[in-house]
């Protein structure tokens, strides 16, 4: 048993502490006989274990709170009537009760403690310690965060932040504590502790630390970004891909011709781009070996599937969305062959790609943005929310999520835009808006065409292509690109009647204009209005 002292966190009488367990140990633990309910893992035909997370098959943004105190009162971007977001305040008194529930749940139990890093750059990384009573949750964070070397573990010392996952505890008196439900995902930035109660969804542990990095880094002059990143084989040409869940961040950055830096969360400092994580969390709905070979091949021993349909013999049905559309797999990043080693970081990004899945069928498959349009569309963060990545959303509906990640922004969105643009200007980067959604055919733009577009951006051929302007949005779009169907580049050409596009375009333009009003409270925001759509 580990000599680790958990009493300093209030956790008493642990019957056993399994500190930094190996993958082999975790595999035995999560598949052993006698486990019940959501603790139980099932071995699948691909060698990966599958777990179910119950009613929470996505994050629960309505249950996310920060303790409002002297540390956070003037720094956090709090939700308001004018601009609602997920950063809801809870009192220091309520925090005591919430933390007590977690501590009581974890006391007297056999516990797993996993020490990790968040951030690939030694100068800015954080030491994050996770404490939980469920083996597969320990496996999840071992996959998703950066695994310290033996030597780094020996000198780990005290963590910078502690996460207590107590999925079996629920907040019965949530109303009097000012919470939303029996489930709580609460951060205390003064104590540097996060508590997770009554949800089993793995993504809460991952995204919690993203919210924390999003708090710290911009205050230290770094860009903190909800994006994937890759670089050329010689590691000289880096690109970053912003986009909300389901727009293609993981799929498009996992490219056999390039090296992956990471698939979801990155920082950008004076030296370049660095990953926060040590793993990937890919959506696997309708996954096939043909369409996404790299992700498919990453699903093997030590990968962890979530909410996938598996029969008694271990056979997987990736097409079944009866539990959720948000089926996932987490795997350590080295399950992908082409990665940047030994540290997930590379130089500055010259290509910045905004991915948007437009359910309206209005946006061109690719537009070359001006610097002002870059700020405008980054702050707008448009996509159509795709089915099932959060509870209660199943149809495509338009979403404007600032910086392509409003759910994880702890500071005001303009702070992130400012840091990103500063870095882009420093290296002369260009931004491109890529629509991975639908067009006038009623079908989604093919992954083959989208990959062709990405290739043209990365190899620079888009910058030499002839272009034209698209009305209302004044987007500069190429009229021909190698390997891309020329008939889709102007979205109007995909409609039997171009008037149909015009009608939809006016509607979408109006939505952009209306959404952007919330950024016009200061001169910088007002100045950007001209870069947006005009009716």
UniProtKB/Swiss-Prot annotation:
User: Gene3D superfamilies attached here?
Assistant: 3.90.228.20, Phosphoenolpyruvate Carboxykinase, domain 1, Phosphoenolpyruvate Carboxykinase, domain 2
Which pathway does the UniProt entry assign to this protein? Carbohydrate biosynthesis; gluconeogenesis
| Superkingdom assignment | Bacteria
Q: Which residues bind Mn(2+)?
A: 207, 226, 264
Task: Identify the enzyme class.
Answer: lyase
Specify where it is mainly localized: cytoplasm
Catalytic activity from the UniProt record = oxaloacetate + ATP = phosphoenolpyruvate + ADP + CO2
List GO BP terms, alphabetically: gluconeogenesis
Any one Gene Ontology molecular-function term assigned to this protein's record: ATP binding
* Role played: Involved in the gluconeogenesis. Catalyzes the conversion of oxaloacetate (OAA) to phosphoenolpyruvate (PEP) through direct phosphoryl transfer between the nucleoside triphosphate and OAA.
Q: What is this protein called?
A: Phosphoenolpyruvate carboxykinase (ATP)
Which species is listed as the source? Porphyromonas gingivalis (strain ATCC 33277 / DSM 20709 / CIP 103683 / JCM 12257 / NCTC 11834 / 2561)
Organism lineage: Bacteria, Pseudomonadati, Bacteroidota, Bacteroidia, Bacteroidales
């Amino acid at each position: 048993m580990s000599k680790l002292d958990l009493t300093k966190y209030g956790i008493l009488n642990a019957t056993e502490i399994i500190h930094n367990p190996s993958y082999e140990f975790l595999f035995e633990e999560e598949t052993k006989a006698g486990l019940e309910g959501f603790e139980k893992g099932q071995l699948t035909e691909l060698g990966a274990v599958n777990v179910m997370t119950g009613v929470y098959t996505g994050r629960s943004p309505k249950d996310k709170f920060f303790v409002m105190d002297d540390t956070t009162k003037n720094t956090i971007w709090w939700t308001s009537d004018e601009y609602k977001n997920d950063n809801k305040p809870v009192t220091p008194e309520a925090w005591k009760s919430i933390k007590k529930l977690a501590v009581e749940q974890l006391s007297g139990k056999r516990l797993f403690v996993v020490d990790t890093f968040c951030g690939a750059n030694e100068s800015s990384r954080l030491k994050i310690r996770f404490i939980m009573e469920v083996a597969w949750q320990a496996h999840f964070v071992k996959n998703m965060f950066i695994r310290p070397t033996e030597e780094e573990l020996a000198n780990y010392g005290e963590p910078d932040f502690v996460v207590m996952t107590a999925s079996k505890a629920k907040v019965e008196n949530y109303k009097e504590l000012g919470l939303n439900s029996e489930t709580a995902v609460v951060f205390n930035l003064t104590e540097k502790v996060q508590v997770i109660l009554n949800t089993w969804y793995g993504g809460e542990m991952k995204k919690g630390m993203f919210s924390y990095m999003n708090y710290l880094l911009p205050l230290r002059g770094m860009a903190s970004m909800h994006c994937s990143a890759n670089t050329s084989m010689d590691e000289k040409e880096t690109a970053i891909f912003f986009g909300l869940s389901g727009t293609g961040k993981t799929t498009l950055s996992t490219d056999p011709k390039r090296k992956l830096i990471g698939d979801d969360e990155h920082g950008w400092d004076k030296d370049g781009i660095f990953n926060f994580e040590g793993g990937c969390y890919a959506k696997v709905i309708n996954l096939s070996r043909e369409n996404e070979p790299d992700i498919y091949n990453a699903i093997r021993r030590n990968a962890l599937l979530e909410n996938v349909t598996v029969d008694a013999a271990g056979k997987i049905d990736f097409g079944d969305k009866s539990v959720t559309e948000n089926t996932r797999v987490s795997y350590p990043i080295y399950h992908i062959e082409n990665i940047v080693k030994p540290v997930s970081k590379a130089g500055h990004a010259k290509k910045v790609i905004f991915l948007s899945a437009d359910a309206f069928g209005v946006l061109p498959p690719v537009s070359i943005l001006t610097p002002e349009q870059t700020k405008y569309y980054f702050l707008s963060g448009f996509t159509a929310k795709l089915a099932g990545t959060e509870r209660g959303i199943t149809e495509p509906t338009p979403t404007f999520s600032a910086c392509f990640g409003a759910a994880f922004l702890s500071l005001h969105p303009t702070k992130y835009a400012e840091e990103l643009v500063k870095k882009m200007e420093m290296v002369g980067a260009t931004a491109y808006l890529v629509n991975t959604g639908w067009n006038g055919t009623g079908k989604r733009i093919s992954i083959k065409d989208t990959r062709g577009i990405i290739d043209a951006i990365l190899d620079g051929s888009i910058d030499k292509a002839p272009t034209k302007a698209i009305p209302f949005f004044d987007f500069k779009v190429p009229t021909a690109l190698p390997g891309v169907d020329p008939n889709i580049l102007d979205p109007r050409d995909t409609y039997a009647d171009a008037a149909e596009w015009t009608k939809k375009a006016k509607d979408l333009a109006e939505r952009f204009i209306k959404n952007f009003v919330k950024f016009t409270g200061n001169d910088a925001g007002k100045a950007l209005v001209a870069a947006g759509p005009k009716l």
